[in-house]
């Protein structure tokens, strides 16, 4: 199904119907071409899927109720991906650069590494196997994998403040990169390994920022009135996609909001609309979802009914 204006106008109307009461969620899993802005709906399903990643081999993975699923873009077949005991995952997950490993943010109350029902970061072989815990402190939410495959970037709450941290894929001591008041979240590496893009509330408004991989020289990138979240550099290093909440959500990124995907040209810093506004938010594009050739982005929109 190809669409543009009519579809988004329709699902935007659903936002007026959304409430905290439990309602049936329909997920629309899309890809959007960054050059033509053509949107293809890969799958429509009456279940709540979140946070697509695009594997180097060309399929998607998504989260549903804590478990991870693959979606074949050609056959539309959905299969559960075996992740061992890690079956209470949130929507912060993603592939290693070589596609052999999957990072998970798993809530395991029974694992000795966790002190409470909050996520630690694990990695698991993409073909299945037992997860290996990476972070010992909780909560820790994975967001990025360094291009050399050696380091993970994540958001973590320590002593009441959420900041950006990095850690070796072998575990060990974590390194704190941000030290300002307010939420710092969504870190993702540029493919040349020079920068980390992230979103921060340090200015009193949620914006996209960039810093060195050691946390040096933080620089604000967006300055508009939207609440901007989850920047993801493209594999060819030319673009950064992010999700914009079209109202001031302060330090929240909730489900059931009017949002829009935006695209930053890394050379000129020009920002353009990649989609029209639609009904989404949490789960739409939390994690890296670029196609391997940097021509498309995968995302999820929603419809909520009785």
Predicted feature locations:
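Sequence signature of WD/YWTD-type beta-propeller architectures
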Residues: 22-306
């Amino acid at each position: 199904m190809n669409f543009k204006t009519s579809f988004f106008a329709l699902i935007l109307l659903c936002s007026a119907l959304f409430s905290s009461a439990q309602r049936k969620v329909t997920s629309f899993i899309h890809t959007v071409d960054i050059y033509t802005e053509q949107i293809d709906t890969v799958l429509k399903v009456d279940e709540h899927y979140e946070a697509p990643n695009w594997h180097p081999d060309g399929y998607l993975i998504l989260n549903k109720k804590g478990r991870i699923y693959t979606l074949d873009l050609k056959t539309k077949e959905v299969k559960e991906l075996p992740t061992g005991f890690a079956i209470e995952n949130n929507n912060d997950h993603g592939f290693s650069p070589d596609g052999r490993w999957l990072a998970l943010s798993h809530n395991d109350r029974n694992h000795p590494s966790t002190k409470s029902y909050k996520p630690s970061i694990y990695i698991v072989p993409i073909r299945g196997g037992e997860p290996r815990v990476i972070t010992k402190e909780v909560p820790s939410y994975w967001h990025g994998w360094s291009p050399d495959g050696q380091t993970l970037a994540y958001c973590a709450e320590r002593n009441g403040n959420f900041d950006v941290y990095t850690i070796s894929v072998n575990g060990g001591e974590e390194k704190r990169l941000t030290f300002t008041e307010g939420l710092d979240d969504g870190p993702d590496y540029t493919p040349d390994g020079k920068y980390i893009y992230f979103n921060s509330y340090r200015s009193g408004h949620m914006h996209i920022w960039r810093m060195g991989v050691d946390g040096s020289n933080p620089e604000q990138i967006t300055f508009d009135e939207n609440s901007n979240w989850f920047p993801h550099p493209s594999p060819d290093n030319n673009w950064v996609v992010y999700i914009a909440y079209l109202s001031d959500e302060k330090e929240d990124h909730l489900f059931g909001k009017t949002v829009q995907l935006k695209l930053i040209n890394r050379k000129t810093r020009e920002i353009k609309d990649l989609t029209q506004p639609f009904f989404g938010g949490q789960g739409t594009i939390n994690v890296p979802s670029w196609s391997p050739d940097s021509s498309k982005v995968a995302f999820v929109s929603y419809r909520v009914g009785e």
